[in-house]
């Protein structure tokens, strides 16, 4: 029992370290990608090829003054960034990064926790992220923050419906809620080939769930200064920032797990295949941000309720018919 607990703690520490490092360098890579697409140089001056830029940004944020605006709800104001960060981290408790490896004569699963109802927990953890957004907007005592928080709440709740329906089709197709079993069932064929519409719906909603362009209405600079981020700076802002990029990694890892065979690929390098698939999705997020204009808020909500939800319901009915009948 104690050995199992130690193994879980070691897995958790390794995953957290990798996620924080990946999120830090995602900010650097995104700036490089956007600069190249916009015919600019990007941040290339700090260290060789700019590789120390994330470290410099972290030191800058760490050294900033611990400022708190007047008349804020102090406890909630400080709690909101933590909620955004930790809800993103919790998702990786369920993600299987690979199969089984043998270390010191002991078989180790490359997954922190294999829960029989993993898909349900995924939806639950992703739903909790909305609290960080709405509480940050409400506690900041700022009209821009409040409007951004309300926008983010409405957007995330609206797009969770088609996302949940798309994941339900995966459950119907595989007959299990365990993420590890879903990956193992994709050893010979990925679910993207049998559930392409479900993947498209999931991928579109993942942009809305992460508040990324073209669905970044909660923090639209031209309208809301910085939205629910407006009154945050220093490490509190860094917590929101890390939460956003870890959330991008999370939705990319979920897409890889549920639709693209997880760690399966040619050769005996499961972790590398998993990482490569996730990296491709992360690059698409960056590419879309650099190339697509932002939706209007009414277009965003109309698209979610009038287009995605009906298509997701119809797709679920068709999948259920061909699976169960």
Swiss-Prot record:
> What GO CC annotations are associated with the protein?
plasma membrane
GO MF assignments:
NADH dehydrogenase activity; oxidoreductase activity, acting on NAD(P)H, quinone or similar compound as acceptor; quinone binding
Biological process (GO), any one: aerobic respiration
EC category name: translocase
| Record localization | Cell inner membrane
Whether Translocase counts among this entry's keywords is: yes
Q: Which residues form a coiled coil?
A: none
**Does this UniProt record's set of keywords contain Cell membrane?**
yes
Keyword terms of this UniProt record:
Cell inner membrane, Cell membrane, Membrane, NAD, Quinone, Translocase, Transmembrane, Transmembrane helix, Ubiquinone
Transmembrane residues, as ranges? 5-25, 75-95, 117-137, 157-177, 190-210, 240-260, 268-288, 305-325
Which coarse location class applies to the principal site listed for this UniProt protein?
Answer: membrane
EC identifiers of the protein: 7.1.1.-
Catalytic activity of the protein? a quinone + NADH + 5 H(+)(in) = a quinol + NAD(+) + 4 H(+)(out)
Question: What membrane topology does the UniProt entry give?
Answer: Multi-pass membrane protein
Subunit info? NDH-1 is composed of 14 different subunits. Subunits NuoA, H, J, K, L, M, N constitute the membrane sector of the complex.
Functional description taken from the UniProt entry: NDH-1 shuttles electrons from NADH, via FMN and iron-sulfur (Fe-S) centers, to quinones in the respiratory chain. The immediate electron acceptor for the enzyme in this species is believed to be ubiquinone. Couples the redox reaction to proton translocation (for every two electrons transferred, four hydrogen ions are translocated across the cytoplasmic membrane), and thus conserves the redox energy in a proton gradient. This subunit may bind ubiquinone.
Q: Per its UniProt record, what NCBIfam families does this chain match?
A: PRK06076.1-2
How is this protein named in the record? NADH-quinone oxidoreductase subunit H
């Amino acid at each position: 029992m104690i050995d199992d607990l130690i193994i879980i703690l070691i897995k958790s520490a390794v995953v957290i370290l990798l996620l924080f490092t990946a999120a830090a360098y995602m900010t650097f890579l995104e700036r490089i990608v956007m600069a190249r697409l916009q015919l600019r140089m990007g941040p290339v001056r700090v260290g060789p090829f700019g590789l120390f830029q994330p470290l410099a940004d972290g030191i800058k944020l760490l050294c900033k003054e611990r400022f708190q605006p007047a008349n804020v709800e102090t406890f909630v104001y400080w709690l909101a960034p933590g909620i955004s960060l930790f809800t993103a981290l919790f998702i990786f408790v369920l993600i299987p990064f690979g199969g089984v490896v043998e270390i010191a004569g002991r078989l180790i699963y490359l997954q922190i926790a294999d829960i029989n109802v993993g898909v349900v927990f995924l939806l639950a953890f992703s739903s909790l992220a909305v609290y960080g957004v709405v509480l940050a907007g409400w506690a900041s005592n700022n009209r821009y923050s409040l409007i951004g928080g309300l926008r983010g709440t409405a957007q995330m709740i609206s797009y969770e419906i088609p996302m949940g329906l798309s994941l339900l089709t995966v459950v119907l197709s595989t007959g299990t809620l365990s993420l590890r079993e879903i990956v193992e069932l994709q050893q010979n064929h990925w679910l993207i080939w049998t559930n392409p519409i479900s993947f498209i719906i999931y991928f579109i909603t993942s942009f809305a769930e992460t508040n990324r362009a073209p669905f970044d209405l909660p923090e639209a600079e031209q309208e809301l200064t910085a939205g629910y981020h407006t009154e945050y700076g220093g490490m509190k802002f860094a917590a929101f920032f890390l939460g956003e990029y870890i959330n991008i990694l999370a939705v990319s890892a979920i897409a890889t797990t549920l639709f693209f065979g997880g760690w399966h690929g040619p050769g005996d390098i499961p972790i590398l295949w998993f990482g490569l698939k996730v990296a491709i999705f992360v690059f698409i997020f960056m590419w879309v941000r650099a190339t697509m204009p932002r939706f209007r808020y009414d277009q965003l909500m109309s698209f979610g309720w009038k287009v995605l939800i009906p298509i997701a319901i119809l797709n679920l009915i068709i999948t259920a018919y061909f699976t169960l009948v």
